[in-house]
C-alpha cells in the first residue's frame, strides 16, 4: 500500500513520520478595534482607531506545518524571513506548535510575509476591514537560494517526505525561486520512495514527479 493510500485510510498515517515544509512562511495578525474608543487629535483630520486586542495565527507554510504537526508528525521548516519583529513572532508561533525552525533563515534585506487583518466592532457587529499585506518585495539573493538548497540536501535523507508551499505569484522574490523549483523537481525524481506534495497558487505547472494540491481556480490558471 502506498503512502497516499495509507494516508487516506488511516488517521494515524502521519504519526511518527518526519517531513520538511519548505516555502513561503506567513504570519496572520488579526487586529481588533472598537469604535467606542475612536478619537480625533489636533494633528490629524482623520479619526484614530484604537486596538484593544491582537491575535497571531499561522499563514501559508506556517499553517501547513501546524496541520502536519497536529497529526503526530515531526516538521523541519525551511524558508526565508526578515530580521524583524514579525519574523520573531512567526518563529515563536512555530516553536509553540513544536516545529524545528533551525532552517528558517533571517535576512536584514527581507521582509517577513505578514497579513494584517483589522476587525472593527461597531453597533455590536464586527466589520472586516481591508486587508493589509506586507510581503517581501526584493529579489531572492543567490546566497538565500543556497541556504534553501543546502538545507534541503542536508535533511532529505532523514525525512519521509517534503511539502512545498508557494503562496505568492512572483516566485523570483519567494523562497521557491525557479532555481529552487528545479532542485526540488530533481529531488522528487531521485528520491521516488519519498512523498512529495506541492501547494502552489500560480505555478503548479512548473513542478514534476510529485503530488499537486490546488483548487479549481488555480488548476484552470495553470492550464
Model-identified regions with their sequence ranges:
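Ribokinase/PfkB-type carbohydrate-kinase core domain
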Residues: 1-39, 50-223
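Active-site gating loops and adjacent loop-to-helix segments of metal-dependent hydrolytic enzymes
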Residues: 43-47
